[in-house]
Amino acid sequence: MKFVHQREHLNEDDLVVIECSQLCNIRLMSDANFRSFKNGGRHTYHGGAFDRFPAKIAVPSTGFWNITIDTAGRKLDSHGGRKTTFTHSIKIVRRTSTRLS
């Protein structure tokens, strides 16, 4: 599965704000869960399928977090079977100062 990935050190209550050009799955995962996700295994995450943007996910605890965006399972558009253009942005709204632990 193809996906966009970004790893960030985030603090509790920071907000991950996603803009996307189409319906997508957004996951906020720990390193261990991201490894499982990459390998097709069971994983837990914060987020889900979003069709309204900006999507906002609050960070549950301070640490390193993996943000993924994918459009798995989305249908081709009606323009001759071509895929729609996928654009996205990931912004972090810091509610506290960054502290590497």
Positions of PLM-derived features:
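Acidic, Ser/Thr/Pro
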Residues: 1-101
